[in-house]
Amino acid sequence: MENRIKRPRVDGECVKSINNGEFDRWDVEDTVAYLRGEGLQEWAQIFKDNGITGAGLLCLTEAHLEKMGVSPLGARLHILHCLQKLSQISTEPMKVFNDPIHGHIELHPLLLHFIDTPQFQRLRHIKQLGGTYLVFPGASHNRFEHSIGVGYLAGCLVKALNERQPELFITKQDILCVQIAGLCHDLGHGPFSHMFDGMFIPKARPADKWKHEIASVQMFDHLVEVNGLEAVMLHHGMRLPEDLIFIKEQIAGPLESAVLDQSQWPYKGRPVEKSFLYEVVANKRNGIDVDKWDYFARDCYHLGIQNNFDYQRFLRFARVCEVKGRKHICTRDKEVGNLYDMFHTRNCLHRRAYQHKVGNIIETMITEAFLKADPHIQIQGSSGRIFTISSAIEDMEAYSKLTDHIFEQILYSSGPELSEARAILQNIICRRLYKCVGQTTSETNVDVSQEKLLDWAKELARSKPTGTEGNLIAEDFVVSVIHMDYGMKEKNPINNVHFYCKNDPTKAIKIHKKQVSKLLPERFAEQLIRVYCKKTDDKSLEAAKKYFVQWCMDRNFTKPQDGDIIAPELTPLKQDWHAREDEDEEEEEKHRQNQTLPHHTPQRTGRNVKVDLFQARGETKL
């Protein structure tokens, strides 16, 4: 009878760490002890020789084992089966969603515990593009489906890096944390998305520097606590509190105050060796992240605008390279043009949809209605306390009840205290909107505050041209300043992107704009200044347009596109405007002359010259 090899018992500490889901903290000896305990002592030495620690166990595939020297297929499969027992993460069935953008997508069951909570389901009732839906009828999608898409794409990118570079030792816990961060990155959005944090809160609470990313972290903590998800996370092999810290850092950046020494690693959730993981969901370095990938595809789909960026191609070429001691996600050098196209797509979306002049004024009017209704709306929070729309951000239980429904709550109210707010929303529904009287730009970017906008409205009221009928006051004007950029204000985001070449995929390089094309933008940011008039009768609008042209002249802003039409008696008075137009015309005339001049044709005064291209050198026929 064949002698059976007695299976040695696994060390007690090793068993305890398995039960606690902390096997990724094992050193090489712990790994060897576990393998021997599973009857794999024949192959334990190979793991020891290759220096495999617990952090790398779940990253191993059959191909990795074969390269390490585990030749028999049966042995490789046996080892993989034993490694999978370390965590339930790789053995549980996935949940399938049918998404109109990404098709059939799979999400880990742990993610469902986050999705199936009131705090996450709240995102079903917050429009992704806020008031833009009232301009683009197809833009009816919500933060809910966008968040699921970001969670899915986050997993796609990290898994692609793991398959391409197993030496990164990306664990299943890493993948889950990145997916959860993608899933929960927008939990803090308020009614009508960016209208709430970009327009309403700055006016309702001007002293506060509130951002929806901070609210997302607070809502995430609230979600985990009230739904008892810490125990669920531990059951799925997560490490607490490190993984919770890591998830929140991906959403809002370092949780502690900024580190003065830039060389010091500011994050606590993951070590500097895994710095690239912080570039997946919200890439603070260059803005290339899965959040953009999803909203590009999803917003374009619902807006009816062509999306020119293919994230699938980026996934194919993404890899991690080390730069100055930190690891960054890089892409192939030949993809630099596609990345410029990506940021150009972002700019086009802002121009055509996100900053649409009608969509913007609708959100301005909604903001005005919310400000008037703010003291009269009561929302119950924790411990029975009552909050208003603007103070609900202080209490996550109250904030979780704040969605786009507040619009209908005001619109369908009957109390006299909400009459002013109700009237504004009724005007929106009936399309009685404030009218845009013009748009201009400044030669240099202006630091804009709420006080500056109010001062400009007062200046407009004083800019009445001579002979203009009607009187307008500051309260009749709304001044809006829109910032257009490539995502990093005046900076070129591609300057913060690293690439690699086919010849050496381990070395990161930078590619200057001049190496790509001479047709790329010289500037990466500008300001658009729009003026609206609240009075919508023809006489007031005609006067407001003349006020606006005069104000642009006084402020030395660019001439409005229709300035010569709406105020032909004013624009000739601004010499700078016409000097620029004369320069443009002279430039065009020179270009036209260069195009019409014959090339390589001998000229002689007073006589026609005919050239025989096939004549002998030195002969001329006249």
Swiss-Prot record:
Allosterically activated and regulated via the combined actions of GTP and dNTPs (dATP, dGTP, dTTP and dCTP): Allosteric site 1 binds GTP, while allosteric site 2 binds dNTP. Allosteric activation promotes the formation of highly active homotetramers. This is Deoxynucleoside triphosphate triphosphohydrolase SAMHD1. The active site is at H212. Residues 143-296 form the HD domain. DCTP binds at Q128, R143, H189, H194, K292, Y295, D299, R346, Q355. It comes from Danio rerio (Zebrafish). It is found in: Nucleus; Chromosome. GO terms for biological process: dATP catabolic process; defense response to virus; deoxyribonucleotide catabolic process; dGTP catabolic process; DNA damage response; DNA strand resection involved in replication fork processing; double-strand break repair via homologous recombination; innate immune response. Pfam families: HD, SAM_2. It comes from the Eukaryota. Protein that acts both as a host restriction factor involved in defense response to virus and as a regulator of DNA end resection at stalled replication forks. Has deoxynucleoside triphosphate (dNTPase) activity, which is required to restrict infection by viruses: dNTPase activity reduces cellular dNTP levels to levels too low for retroviral reverse transcription to occur, blocking early-stage virus replication in dendritic and other myeloid cells. The gene is samhd1. GO terms for molecular function: deoxynucleoside triphosphate hydrolase activity; dGTP binding; dGTPase activity; GTP binding; nucleic acid binding; RNA binding; single-stranded DNA binding; triphosphoric monoester hydrolase activity. It is an enzyme of class 3 (hydrolase). Belongs to the SAMHD1 family.
